[in-house]
Amino acid sequence: MTSREDFLRRVRDALEALPNDERMVPVPRNYQRNAPVPSAEDQAEIVELFIDRLKHHGAQVHRVGADEIPGAIDSALRAHGARSALAPDGLPEHWLRRWELTGEHRVLDDQPHLSILDRERTDAVVTGCAGAVADAGTLILDGGPGQCRRDAAVLADCHICVVRVEQIDYSLPQVLDKLDPRRSITWFGGPTAMTDPEADSGKVGGVIEETERRLVVVIVG
């Protein structure tokens, strides 16, 4: 008998020696969930923590009012030198209108028929998000309105993500309660992206390539 087998045998023997009412120990699963709505002061601290974490990950962060979103997106796209941008279904049209109407700029709708090659050739993608985790500096996309599919988010050299203050929660458990588990969820927190080998026919099968990109987070509110 190996040391591992002996250890497991002793664990089984110890469990069998327990009274029936002590073998199953309930584990709480509602920690940090159903938290009360934070005060304005607490929410401000949560937002500042989120900004600090994003910057630590290497993201660029801009804080704007609701009417300043188009200008912030326009500035970010110009700073990146983008000539084309991918817009997911449900993204407010006016967010990109200012940038689209000046210069030779092109907005592509993120439709199912759009090929991987077309997505790769697009300079940037602009999205909203499903939620954000402040203590981890993590953004969450679930493919809902104004959010792109995972391959589009991963392949873009520049990702501009608009986050409303009320979408930022302190911890992951608080955000999980707001997500639809039936959706495909993408998590990211910085410029580094892991490309999906199944979505990129140009990569060697089974190889995941780490690529550097620009992440710009526009916080509204």
Show where each model-derived region lies.
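The feature marks the mature, well-folded catalytic cores of soluble enzymes
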Residues: 1-221
